[in-house]
From Swiss-Prot:
Glycan-linked positions: N282, N496, N571, N1023, N1057
SUPFAM superfamilies: Concanavalin A-like lectins/glucanases, EGF/Laminin, Fibrinogen C-terminal domain-like, Galactose-binding domain-like
Protein name: Contactin-associated protein like 5-3
Keyword line: Cell adhesion, Disulfide bond, EGF-like domain, Glycoprotein, Membrane, Repeat, Signal, Transmembrane, Transmembrane helix
Protein's GO biological process: cell adhesion
Membrane topology: Single-pass type I membrane protein
Tissue: Expressed in brain.
Transmembrane region(s): 1236-1256
Membrane topology, Cytoplasmic segments: 1257-1305
Record-stated family: Belongs to the neurexin family.
Source organism: Mus musculus
Location of the EGF-like domain: 546-583, 957-995
Location(s) in or outside the cell: Membrane
């Protein structure tokens, strides 16, 4: 390809850059006064106090001393004609000289023609200028966005309440020159190249346009190999098509790469800038920029022959175009520095033009805006009593509902209503004697586009036409006879009219109308404004103030924007965020926070930056008692085999963690420690080589850097863990695999340098030699500790504070932190701007104030607490401001919220440092602690700044005073350097908050015995001193707690042995009632029976028995019972405690022995005697505790067993099946009549002999089957993909089946 065009394109790009610089440079001196030399005729107004136009230049003192209208109301304005289009950069105002008349606020409007005005906007809203406070001072405003116009209009909004409207004004700027081309919708400009193909690596295309229609092509170019570029108006939005060297892509079939803008058919100027470098491009429309990457295979754009502007002409067919042409004006059209319109005006040979003129023709249409949905209306008159009716107009709106037209017909022919209902047009003709007729047409008409409506009626025929499409007629209109009325109400009805004159079954219309025709005659809306035609209320005439509130989209995190005329709304579904603008994450920032919310181990979504730009990431939170591990899986955690790789053809595997690197980095940076286990199995496959050699294997980390060290080693040291420990197989090497042996070996270790994690890729290059094999495994990313949640500082004096760089925020700001204090008041934080500010403070012990000003005036939100906030307990505060609302939340108290104004300042203007713990003036300082401060999801590291700040200390002790209540069931809160933990040593529960029950499943012969002869505490420290409970002195207090579930009665739950004869037994009797047997001595025995219901009902029941001296209380589930022993009763210390079956039955009480016969079949949980937890000791610390377990004790969950199959709890004794059918109404007894005792004895002897014979036979068959089963187990083969744990599960299930079968026999 010829290189000359490429050089030319680069050269023209440089020229275009100089051209843009030149435009910018001219603005430095664009501040000349523009009204000083205007004639009197240049000024006009809505009305004048003198009845004629008055000069109103700044500092004017003659005559009336400026302009004042005849009446001071919201419909007044002052206008000036500057003669030509100029660039306006500033305005200034004064009051009327020598009077009490001045304007305190106003709006600015501008126009090229004196019609179709446009309001000045700034920060995305219609700007409200601050005016004067007296008649003589000058208030000057520099326009942030300069405007180019010929006509300027000042519209007073507020004025001196003790005077009237009065103004003297000045406009500053400079002359403005431009090249303009007018396209009539049937013509175009062609820019033909000097060579066949123009090939560009970079492009800059800029222009301004104003359009009459919603559709039309602005420019187009294409090449024979598929390159094309097209900029096209589609439904009032600009669509850009751009493709580089892809013959498959066609303009007509592909979707646009970028779409920007909205309502661009408003006949106002809009700017466009396209900048492309290779495949990267920026597309800007009216200061809204979208970055994208082009399609195609190369970096060059190859355009053949020509570029067309205004349309896409068909070759060899003059006057024929592929798409709808542009209808409007284009200004300052530059293509890579070439002024296309200037070439056309000078009739250069490169330009071929159709019917294009070089001055912008302006259609004289006058739009009107219906502002208020309750009171806006327009009344126009027509010719009454004509046989028929004809009305037409155009409208645009965002609202689904509104009255468009209401008119009372003559000759009693009824009332005609045209309504927008749910975005559909509904025509209704109502007569008193009949129900009326209806016509429906269209849908989605609240899309902001202009829609034309025409109603034509003559005799009994009615036609409704929408956008040139006639609606279908109702089936029967023969009864209609329509005669035109005198009054036509558009948009709404006045309050003082009767229903017959104007009907409005729906709210008033909010939107714009234009081109109103009645009886085929156009209506002059300027005459309406001047009061000579019709009447109106709450209208803006000669102005369509429609605004797209969804451009830009202020719904964050992918929220979908919808709007009405006055507001916008965000749909946050499926985004993971909530709030008015989808700003607030619904997920927590770490596993530590989930733990603090009382969650247990499971999968969670973690949003590390909260309301920041990063989305949530799914992790597994393993919430245990010591460390809270957060695990992120990737797509290849299994063992992967590698063969055939060498340095020329390396093996590479990329790991995907289900999230972006930015998400993973935020997660890692917020953790105290992170690690990944890496393993390399090798046989004649080297891993790292020598420390100075080229590594054979390496991995890529977060920064896309190569890391030639392995798990267990340090960053920058090309070694494995065995190299640092000097334990490698070959001392000459620093990795086991580098020994290059013929035997399998491995190098395994943890990578824990956070700045390098996670592992994103592994590369292996030494598996291509003879007998060379390797396999690798990279474990998931695992982290623990939250560096942010417990990040706290203590302010020791009220004069101390921390300062940080300014808080960068545009539209949304949220602040979250915890605090605790004993002070009466204090400022938490403050940040200032020139006028704006943001401050949070505790104004009193029960009040928190969020004070904020973004330019619309200060707002104070107050939350009052019914309890004191200076109680030295942790409280949290969340404050937020967005475009929709401002809110303040303290703890779980009701939120204080205020909606934002529909128009006004949106963007924060904050530039000072962020002050935490006080104000910049060092007043109202905060005394106490602040913790976990987050601004817009970003953590503020308070502790690091406190290390270098006097009067502020890192950390804040005393978490247990606030969070100790989280440690439940006897757990003890323990202070830690970071946060706190719950010590469950003396609790029968476990888990982070001692909430997880410890349960076990008992068979009929299971026995758990705890001996009290040796002191024991459920810790790993066996050297603790003995408790007083182990002395011979009897305890004055005793507490016994347990939960049980069974279907067996009678049964023994717990047996506490004091001596050979004295005991305490908790059991269920034959009828399922609870009995407590208390044998204190040979002479003193007590039996307490609680006969509330049959407790052997497969449900979990709780028993709590508490004795304080002679007072005994027993709580059975929710019922409480009290007993009192005699004062002479003597209590002894316990020697042993048995759960389940008591194996040493000698001397056992007969009733207890009967309950013990069948043992206990069921589930026990949360067993505690004083601070001893025998079941916990048996399941968790059997090796260091004085506990003995006989037969099978299976850890389980009583609650889950209730929810699942209750038959899991069973017994082998079918004659007393605890789950058998039983009439609970029938009393049970163990009394046996004496005359049947002998017969029973004989039967028992015969039965015993029979069962002995059966038992011998059963034993024989069982041994035979057992040997057969063992041989089966030896021959059993497992699939290769079944791991050892799965094999154990299979074997366990098979064994259980065999045991059940034998038990049944």
């Amino acid at each position: 390809m010829d290189s000359v065009p490429r050089l030319n394109s680069v050269f023209t790009l440089v020229l275009s850059g100089l051209w843009h610089f030149g435009l910018t440079a001219t603005n430095y001196n664009c501040d000349d006064p523009l009204t000083s030399f205007l004639s009197l005729r240049a000024f006009s107004s809505s009305s004048d106090l003198t009845g004629r136009s008055s000069p109103a230049q700044l500092n004017w003192r003659m005559g009336t001393g400026g302009w004042s209208p005849a009446d001071s109301n919201a419909q007044q304005w002052l206008q000036m004609d500057l003669g030509n289009r100029v660039e306006i950069t500033a305005v200034a105002t004064q009051g009327r000289y020598g009077s009490s008349d001045w304007v305190t606020s106003y709006r600015l409007m501008f126009s090229d023609t004196g019609h179709n005005w446009q309001q000045y906007t700034q920060e995305g809203s219609i700007w409200r200028f601050v005016g004067n406070m007296n008649a003589n001072s000058v208030v000057h405003h520099k326009l942030l966005n300069s405007v180019r116009a010929r006509f300027v209009r000042f519209v007073p909004l507020e004025w001196n309440p003790n005077g009237k409207i009065g103004m003297r004004v000045e406009v500053y700027g400079c002359s403005y020159r431009s090249d303009v081309a007018d396209f009539d919708g049937w013509s175009s400009l062609l820019y033909r190249f000097n060579q066949k193909t123009m090939s560009t690596l970079k492009d800059v295309i800029s222009l301004k346009f104003k359009s009459i229609q919603r559709d039309g092509v602005l420019f187009h170019g294409e090449g024979q190999r598929g390159d094309h570029i097209t900029l096209e108006l589609q439904n009032g939005r600009l669509a850009l098509y751009l493709n580089l060297d892809d013959s498959k892509a066609q303009v007509s079939s592909t979707a646009p790469l970028a779409t920007l803008g909205s309502l661009l058919d408003d006949q106002h100027w809009h700017s466009v800038l396209l900048e492309r470098v290779g495949k990267q491009a920026n597309f800007t429309v009216d200061k809204n920029t979208q970055h994208f990457q082009t399609k195609g295979e190369t970096d060059a754009l190859d355009i053949d022959y020509e570029l067309s502007f205004g349309g896409i002409p068909v070759p060899s067919k003059p006057g024929t175009f592929l798409k709808k042409n542009f209808h409007g004006c284009i200004e300052n059209l530059y293509y890579n520095g070439v002024n296309i319109i200037d070439l056309a005006k000078r009739r250069k040979h490169q330009i071929y033009s159709g019917n294009v003129t070089f001055s912008c023709s302006e259609p004289q249409t006058v739009p009107i805006t219906f502002v208020n949905s309750r009171s806006s209306y327009l009344l126009l008159t027509g010719t009454p009593q004509i046989d028929g009716l004809s009305v037409s107009f155009q409208f645009r709106t965002w609202n689904e509902d509104g009255l468009l037209l209401s008119t009372e017909l003559s000759e009693g022919s009824g009332t005609l209503l045209l309504i927008l209902e749910g975005g559909t047009l509904r025509l209704l003709i109502k007569k008193l004697a009949r129900h009326g007729t209806e016509i429906f047409t269209g849908s989605g008409l609240n899309d902001g586009m202009w829609h034309s409506v025409s109603i034509s009626a003559r005799r009994n025929r009615v036609t409704l036409t929408l956008d040139n499409d006639a609606a279908s007629l109702p089936p029967d209109t023969s009864w209609l006879q329509i005669y035109s009325g005198n009054s036509y109400y558009f948009g709404g009805c006045p309050d003082n009219l009767t229903d017959s004159q104007c009907l409005n079954p729906i709210k008033a219309f909010q939107g714009c109308m234009r081109l109103i025709f009645i009886d085929n005659q156009p209506k002059d809306l300027i005459s309406v404004q001047q009061g000579s035609l019709g009447s109106f209320s709450d209208l803006h005439i000669d102005l369509c103030s429609i605004k797209d509130r969804c451009l830009p989209n202020y719904c964050e995190h992918g929220g979908q924007c919808a709007q009405t005329w006055t507001n916008f709304y965000c749909n946050c579904s499926d985004t993971g965020y909530t709030g008015a603008t989808c700003h607030d994450s619904i997920y927590e920032q770490s596993c530590e926070v989930y733990r603090h919310r009382g969650k247990t181990a499971e999968f969670f979504y973690v949003d590390s930056d909260g309301s920041g730009p990063l989305g949530p990431l799914q992790v597994f939170c393993n919430i245990t008692e010591d460390k809270i591990w957060m695990t992120v899986q990737h797509n290849n955690t299994g063992l992967t085999w590698v063969q055939g790789s060498n340095p020329e053809k390396p093996y590479a595997m990329t790991l995907n963690y289900g999230g972006s690197l930015e998400q993973l980095e935020a997660l890692i940076d917020g953790s105290e420690h992170c690690e990944q286990e890496v393993t390399y199995y090798c046989k004649r496959s080297r891993l790292l080589n020598t420390p100075d050699g080229v590594p054979f294997t390496w991995w890529i980390g977060r920064s896309n850097e190569k890391h030639p060290y392995w798990g267990g080693s340090l960053p920058g040291v090309q070694q494995c863990g065995c190299g640092l420990e000097e334990s490698c197989l070959d001392i000459r090497h620093f990795c086991n695999c580098d020994a290059d042996t013929d035997e399998w070996t491995n190098d395994t270790g943890y990578l824990s340098f956070k700045d390098h994690l996670p592992v994103t890729q592994i590369i292996i290059t030494d598996t291509n030699r003879s007998k060379s094999e390797a396999a690798w495994r990279i474990g998931p990313l695992r982290c623990y500790g939250d560096r942010h949640f417990w990040n706290a500082v203590s302010f020791s004096t009220e004069a101390s504070f921390l300062h940080f760089p300014t808080f960068r925020v545009e539209f949304s700001a949220d602040i979250f932190f915890f605090f605790k204090t004993t002070a009466l008041s204090g400022v938490f934080l403050e940040i200032l701007g020139i006028k704006d500010f943001l401050r949070l403070e505790m104004s009193s012990p029960s009040e928190v104030i969020f004070a904020i000003d973004v330019g619309n005036g200060p707002i104070d939100l107050l939350v009052q607490s019914p309890y004191p906030l200076n109680d030295n307990q942790w409280h949290y505060i969340r404050a937020e401001r967005n475009l929709k609302e401002t809110s303040l939340q303290v703890d779980n108290l009701p939120q204080s919220m205020r909606e934002a104004s529909e128009e006004g300042h949106f963007q924060f203007q904050l530039n000072s440092q962020l002050f935490v713990g006080g104000k910049s003036s060092r007043q109202k300082g905060f005394f106490g602690c602040i913790r976990s401060l987050h601004l817009n999801g970003q953590n503020i590291d308070l502790e690091e700044r406190a290390k270098v700040t006097s009067g502020v200390r890192p950390g804040c002790p005393g978490h247990c005073s606030s969070y100790g209540r989280n440690c439940q069931n006897g757990g003890k809160c323990v202070e830690k350097h970071i946060g706190y933990s719950c010590d469950c040593t003396n609790s029968p529960y476990e888990g982070p908050f001692c909430q997880k029950e410890i349960s076990a499943l008992f068979d009929s012969d299971t026995s758990v015995t705890y001996m009290f002869q040796e002191p024991y505490s459920v810790t790993k420290n066996t050297n603790l001193s003995s408790s007083a409970i182990y002395t011979d002195t009897a305890p004055s207090k005793e507490i016994i707690m347990l939960s049980f579930m069974t279907a067996q009665a009678p049964t023994l739950l717990l047996y506490l042995n004091f001596s050979s004869q004295n005991f305490l037994a908790i059991l269920l009797s034959w009828n399922g009632s609870l009995q407590i047997h208390y044998q204190l001595s040979k002479e003193e025995s007590h039996v307490f029976t609680i006969n509330t219901e049959n407790l052997a009902n497969r449900r979990v029941h709780q028993v709590k028995m508490s004795r304080d001296g002679p007072e005994l209380s027993i709580q059975m589930d929710q019922q409480l019972f009290s007993y009192t022993f005699s004062l002479e009763s003597e209590f002894q210390r316990a020697r042993s405690l048995v759960l389940g079956k008591v194996t040493e039955t000698l001397g056992l009480d007969p009733e207890v022995a009967r309950a013990n016969t069948l043992g206990f079949v069921g589930c026990l949980s949360s067993v505690q005697y004083n601070h001893i937890t025998p079941l916990k000791a048996a399941l968790r610390h059997a090796s260091i505790s004085p506990v003995t377990v006989q037969r099978t004790l299976t850890e389980s969950s009583c609650v889950s067993m209730v929810d699942s199959d209750a038959n899991a709890v069973t017994t082998v004794y079918s004659s007393t099946d605890p789950f058998g059918e039983r009439d609970e109404r029938e009393p049970l007894t163990n009394a046996v009549p004496s005359d049947l005792a002998v017969i029973g004895g004989i039967i028992a002897v015969v039965t015993f002999i029979s069962f002995s014979v059966i038992g011998i036979m059963t034993h024989f068959f069982y041994q035979h089957k057992r040997s057969h089963y063992a041989s089966q187990m030896k021959e059993k083969e497992y699939p290769e993909n079944v791991d050892s744990s799965s094999r154990n599960d299979i074997d366990l299930q098979n064994t259980t089946r065999e045991c059940k079968q034998e038990d049944f026999i």
